[in-house]
């Protein structure tokens, strides 16, 4: 035993070589057709010969046609009997479940019987030919009025041969029947299970054998009468009368009828005890041979094993309602009542097929199916595969297919139309669902957990609960789909927004890079310079007083350099644009290329009016800051004109020539600073103009037009040196001439040259407010 894909057990011998068996069957059918054609041709030739020789050809033709019709009727009856026997044998096989060896023995017996049948057919053909030859000889002998004794002797010999041949055929048929009975008894003894159905079948077979024996006895008596009549006619030796012709025709008809009793293709032959060599073509089962003759060779549903055929028996309406007729207390789905009445043997077969077969391979799968279960299972969607598997081999293979619908729905309609009341239930009809059945699903779904003792109320509750579960699952799926769609839409909106932001960022970045490029290209050709780039607080190229410079630097630093908390700038630092002590041309040439600030610097013209004048102590020779190399910031002012200076300069000529010069401190600004405010108002110089057209150093001393001090003194023109310069009185006790060394030793010509001064605490702390000013840095310039 093996298990197929659905898990059901089936015999190994059912489908070993199905295609080869089909081919073998087709070959047998072709051979049978050829034999029939040969027989018909021989009969046709014999008829032609008889028509040429016999004067009563028309009557013979009529008799021959009647004989052919009778033979056809007999053939159809034999076919029906064969089908009934095949169905009985199939039922026996399903009940007994024989093993492979039993099937092989049955096949061997059947093949041996087939050989015997072929031999009997050959003998019958030879006998028939001999009989025809004897009849022709008898006709020739009796038809001629001038026949001699030799012809009469040949006729008698022919009749004797015919009698011997008929006796031989009858003996051979009796031997075959005896062998069949013995083999059937042996087969029944070998089988392990004999039920009531087998006993009924044996009784039916015995009745059939008795009927056949009676018919054979009648035929033998008729043959003997036919044998005596021609002999009498031949002994008389005269012409053949109409009575003798009728007798000959009857003899031929009986002979053909006896030939029809011979089996065809070994279907009625019983198995023998001998076992020939098994080949793939001879290894087949009785069930296969039955299906080959009764069903179509092209089964539409094959899944690795041979399924039962979907034969439509009876009336099938369009709405898949299957009519059923009751016979013997059991329900027979789709069987016509006329067939049951005309064929009494078919009742037993139908009863056996309608009921469940004990001991079959589908008994365990049929145990969980009750009446009304199929419709309940079809109302749900999770039991389609199980229903297909468990009912595909139920009720002896008789399944009802839908005649109006083809294709896949035939199988589902057949499943839905199977009558499940074969265990004795008296249901009259079984209506199935609509044609919307789908093919079975392999895998998935729930197994049918149907209890045998479940009440209809429990089944209804289960159905309602399943319907509610289905609706709840559908709502859950819909809710999940809606939530997924909402989230998807939200994600799409956010993605779109992010893309818009990215595009905006890209556009702004491109605009920024474009503006930077334009700014870079414009900075090299821009004509505007920052106002405080080269701003110098100078008066005709020289630095003004300390108080004025402090005010200017404080205002410029507070406007442009807010990070400098001390407002302290170096005199040589060119970063703030203010240069102390240098010429503007020198500052412009030594300045680095820094970014331009185009903001204008506004300086109030009234700034000079708020300059605080601090008193100076005449006792201190040096400035307030002792660590400076140059003079004090208060003494950094523009020198007056040399001409006026020489006129007002008074140099005493005495031994005190090396004394320090005492320069009086004026409380008012010199007259040369009158135009300082105008110079302050426009202090910014154009860098490009300075670079391209160098401005000559401003000449504020007018040394070219005037004579120096020493020349004026040496000239001796009798004029006294000037005592004041532009309103500033000059009182110098020194009368000596200062050379370069004396000027570079620390004096500027305006202060008395004396020994080195030691710093004191009073000199350091006397003017603390001047320290954070830009002019408190030591000056590195030398006044000439």
Curated annotation (Swiss-Prot):
Comp. bias (Low complexity): 97-106, 115-126, 198-227, 380-397
UniProt entry keywords in alphabetical sequence: Activator, DNA-binding, Nucleus, Phosphoprotein, Transcription, Transcription regulation
Predominant subcellular localization, coarse grouping: nucleus
Cellular component terms per the entry's GO annotation: nucleus
InterPro entries documented for this protein: AP-1 (IPR000837), bZIP (IPR004827), bZIP_sf (IPR046347)
GO molecular function: DNA binding; DNA-binding transcription factor activity, RNA polymerase II-specific; RNA polymerase II cis-regulatory region sequence-specific DNA binding
Sequence segments annotated as region (Basic motif): 461-463
Domain bZIP residue range list: 459-522
Keyword flag Phosphoprotein: yes
Localisation: Nucleus
Pfam families on file: bZIP_1
Residues with the Phosphoserine modification: 594
Superkingdom of this protein's organism: Eukaryota
Region annotation (Leucine-zipper) ranges: 464-471
Residue segments, region Disordered: 97-126, 196-231, 358-404, 421-464, 616-635, 759-784
SUPFAM superfamilies registered for this protein in UniProt: Leucine zipper domain
Record field: compositional bias (Polar residues): 365-378, 421-438
Functional note: Developmentally regulated transcription factor AP-1 binds and recognizes the enhancer DNA sequence: 5'-TGA[CG]TCA-3'. May play a role in the function or determination of a particular subset of cells in the developing embryo. It is able to carry out its function either independently of or in conjunction with Jra.
Subunit architecture: Homodimer. Heterodimer with Jra. The kay-Jra heterodimer binds more stably to the AP-1 site than either of the two proteins alone.
Family: Belongs to the bZIP family. Fos subfamily.
Protein name: Transcription factor kayak
Organism expressing this protein natively: Drosophila mojavensis
């Amino acid at each position: 035993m093996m298990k197929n894909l659905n898990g059901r057990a089936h015999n190994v011998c059912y489908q070993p070589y199905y295609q080869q068996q089909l081919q073998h069957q087709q070959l047998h059918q072709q051979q049978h057709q050829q034999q029939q054609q040969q027989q018909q041709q021989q009969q046709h030739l014999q008829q032609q010969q008889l028509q040429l020789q016999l004067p009563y050809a028309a009557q013979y033709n009529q008799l021959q046609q009647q004989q052919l019709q009778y033979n056809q009727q007999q053939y159809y009856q034999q076919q029906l009997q064969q089908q009934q026997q095949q169905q009985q044998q199939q039922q026996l096989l399903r009940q007994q479940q024989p093993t492979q060896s039993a099937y092989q023995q049955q096949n061997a017996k059947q093949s041996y019987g087939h050989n015997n049948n072929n031999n009997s057919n050959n003998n019958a053909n030879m006998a028939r030919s001999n009989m025809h030859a004897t009849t022709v000889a008898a006709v020739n002998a009796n038809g001629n009025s001038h026949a001699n004794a030799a012809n009469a002797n040949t006729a008698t010999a022919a009749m004797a041969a015919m009698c011997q041949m008929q006796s031989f055929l009858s003996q051979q048929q009796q031997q075959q029947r005896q062998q069949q009975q013995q083999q059937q008894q042996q087969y029944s003894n070998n089988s392990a299970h004999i039920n009531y159905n087998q006993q009924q079948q044996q009784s039916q077979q015995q009745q059939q054998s008795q009927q056949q024996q009676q018919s054979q006895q009648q035929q033998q008596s008729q043959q003997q009468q036919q044998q005596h009549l021609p002999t009498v006619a031949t002994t008389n030796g005269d012409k053949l009368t109409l009575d003798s012709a009728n007798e000959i025709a009857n003899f031929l008809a009986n002979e053909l009828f006896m030939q029809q009793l011979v089996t065809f293709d070994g279907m009625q032959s019983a198995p023998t005890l001998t076992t020939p060599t098994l080949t793939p073509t001879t290894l087949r089962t009785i069930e296969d041979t039955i299906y080959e003759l009764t069903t179509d060779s092209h089964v539409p549903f094959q899944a690795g094993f041979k399924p039962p055929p979907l034969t439509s028996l009876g009336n099938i309406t369009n709405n898949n309602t299957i009519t059923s007729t009751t016979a013997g207390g059991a329900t027979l789905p789709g069987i016509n009542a006329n067939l049951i009445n005309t064929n009494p043997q078919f009742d037993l077969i139908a009863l056996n097929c309608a009921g469940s077969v004990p001991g079959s391979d589908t008994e365990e799968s049929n145990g969980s199916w009750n009446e009304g279960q199929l419709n309940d299972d079809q109302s749900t969607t999770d039991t389609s595969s199980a229903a297909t598997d468990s009912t595909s081999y139920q009720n002896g293979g008789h399944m009802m297919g839908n005649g109006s619908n083809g294709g896949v729905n035939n199988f589902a309609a057949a499943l839905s139309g199977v009558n499940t009341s074969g265990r004795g239930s008296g249901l009259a009809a079984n209506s199935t669902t609509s044609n919307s059945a789908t093919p079975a699903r392999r895998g998935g779904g729930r197994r049918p957990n149907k209890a045998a003792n479940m009440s209809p109320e429990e089944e209804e509750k289960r159905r309602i609960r399943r319907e509610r579960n289905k609706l709840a699952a559908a709502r859950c799926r819909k809710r999940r789909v809606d939530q997924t769609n909402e989230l998807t839409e939200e994600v799409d909106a956010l993605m779109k927004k992010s893309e818009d932001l990215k595009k905006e960022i890209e556009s702004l970045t491109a605009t920024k890079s474009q503006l930077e490029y334009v700014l870079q290209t414009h900075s090299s050709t821009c004509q505007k310079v920052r106002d405080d780039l080269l701003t110098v607080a100078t008066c005709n190229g020289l630095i003004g007083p300390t108080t004025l410079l402090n005010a200017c630097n404080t205002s410029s630093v507070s406007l442009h350099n807010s990070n400098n908390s001390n407002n302290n700038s170096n005199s040589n630092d060119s970063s703030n644009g203010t240069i102390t002590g240098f010429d503007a041309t020198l500052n412009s040439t030594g300045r680095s290329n820094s970014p331009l600030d185009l903001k204008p610097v506004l300086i109030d013209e009234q700034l000079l009016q708020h300059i605080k004048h601090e008193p100076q102590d005449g006792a201190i020779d040096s400035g307030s800051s002792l660590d400076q190399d140059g003079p004090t910031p208060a003494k950094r002012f523009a020198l007056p004109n040399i001409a006026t200076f020489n006129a007002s300069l008074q140099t005493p000529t005495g031994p005190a020539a090396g004394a320090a010069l005492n320069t009086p401190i004026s409380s008012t600004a010199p007259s040369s600073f009158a135009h300082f405010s105008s110079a302050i108002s426009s202090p910014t110089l154009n860098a490009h103009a300075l670079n391209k057209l160098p401005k000559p150093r401003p000449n504020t001393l007018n040394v070219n037009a005037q004579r120096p001090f020493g020349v004026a003194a040496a000239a001796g023109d009798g004029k006294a040196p000037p005592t004041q310069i532009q309103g500033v009185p000059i009182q110098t006790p020194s009368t000596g001439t200062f050379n370069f060394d004396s000027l570079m030793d620390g004096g500027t010509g305006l202060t008395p040259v004396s020994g080195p001064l030691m710093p004191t605490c009073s000199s350091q702390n006397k003017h603390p407010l001047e320290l954070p000013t830009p002019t408190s840095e030591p000056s590195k310039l030398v006044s000439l």
